[in-house]
Amino acid sequence: MNHIDVIVVGSGAGGMLAAIRAHDLGLKVILLEKSDRYGGTSAQSGGAIWIPNNYSSHPGDSTEAALAYLKTVTEGAVPEAKLARYAEVSVQMPAYLASLGVHYYVDPPLTAPDYYPSAPGASPGGRTMCVKPMDGAVLGEEFFRLREQQPQHRLLEKISIDIPEGIQLSNKSKGWIGTLLRIFANYFGNRRWRRRTYRDQRLTLGNSLIGGLLKATGG
């Protein structure tokens, strides 16, 4: 039997990132998934990450503010040392993900306040980062094993949208009709892909995160 240094159970974002990072460090890794689809609940999520003090954060953001917020909302359930470590080094995560081909951004800034806005250290926006869409065709046949988004996260239960698009369409804010037409044209105009599947070639939200991580593994 081949020697394995690390066994990772589950192919969600946490599992895939753990496997990739262990491989980066020179360890032999095996990732196990019980389902016939990969991605877990991460694939069905919004795919966003909470990164305090990132390049697009509110000007008053800081590691100290983030730690104060985390200590308040976790109510002692997480050791302070772990919270402090997260507040300090999580800002490195977007760059690491970008090196894997998974790109995050804040758009538009200051529109996603922290869940507990009255808590000490809360930010009015900028800490929640969205994942950029990706072309599902680069996954080859593995595209069809990627766990699908929930129907309510898609237009007509099948057309992918990202978080800024969803906000714009829901609020019918400036330019929403043009955005809707562009999304429809991208989906219905892709005749070659439509002959293969009803699923959108454009991956967004958690599907984009998981698809990008799978591509990074060479899978």
Segments from the language model and where they lie:
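Conserved N-terminal/central alpha/beta ligand/cofactor-binding core
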Residues: K34-G219
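N-terminal Rossmann-like FAD-binding beta1-loop-alpha1 element of flavoenzymes
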Residues: D5-L31
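A short, basic/flexible loop-to-alpha-helix module at the beginning of a structural domain
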Residues: M1-H3
